[in-house]
Amino acid sequence: MQHENLSNGAWAEMTLAEQMANIGSESYRATKWLAKGRRDNAERAFERMQELVDLTIAYGRFNSPSRKALLKEICRFRELFCKAFLDSNLTELSALNHYLDQFAKIRA
């Protein structure tokens, strides 16, 4: 695990917007490296992004019905990002990164 300091509880202290913005940082890195043909760097960023999604799901507060819908949305994002990354679909990755931009704006 590359984010051990976050798995010790620091991630749970962040707001969902902060968590999603951090996921966005790694997804942008993965996309950038993939576009440059640096598959090794792209895969490391992709793995870090997956870890952050895992932490969001593990530490999420998804007890209410509206939060359960959000959990589904996060899982669907992961599914779409994984497919786009494995297919090297830069157009789809860009669209998914744009989705995450909205969380960075909330956080700012």
Predicted regions and their residues:
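Surface-exposed peri-terminal alpha-helical interaction modules
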Residues: 1-108
